[in-house]
Swiss-Prot record:
NCBIfam families: PRK13682.1-4, PRK13682.1-5. The chain crosses the membrane at residues 4-24, 30-47. It holds the Pfam family DUF1328. It is found in: Cell membrane. The lineage of its organism: Bacteria, Pseudomonadati, Pseudomonadota, Gammaproteobacteria, Enterobacterales. This is UPF0391 membrane protein PC1_0455. Belongs to the UPF0391 family. It comes from Pectobacterium carotovorum subsp. carotovorum (strain PC1). Its main location: membrane. The keyword Hydrolase does not apply. It is a multi-pass membrane protein. One of its GO terms (cellular component) is plasma membrane.
Length: 53
């Protein structure tokens, strides 16, 4: 999940540097969503992790 977030962030930075404003905004939004979902899944797995039998 975090890898996808970083990939979208890099795409957004490259698009912003080249002047593609719409594409940069879309990629940055996707990066934020993927990052937040990754954090939520991490916290869920942390709290509901492997329990002793």
């Amino acid at each position: 999940m975090f890898r996808w977030g970083i990939i979208f962030l890099v795409i957004a930075l490259i698009a912003a540097a080249l002047g593609f404003g719409g594409l940069a905004g879309t990629a940055a939004g996707a990066a934020k969503i993927v990052f937040v979902v990754g954090i939520i899944l991490f916290l869920l797995s942390l709290f509901t992790g492997r329990k002793r039998p």
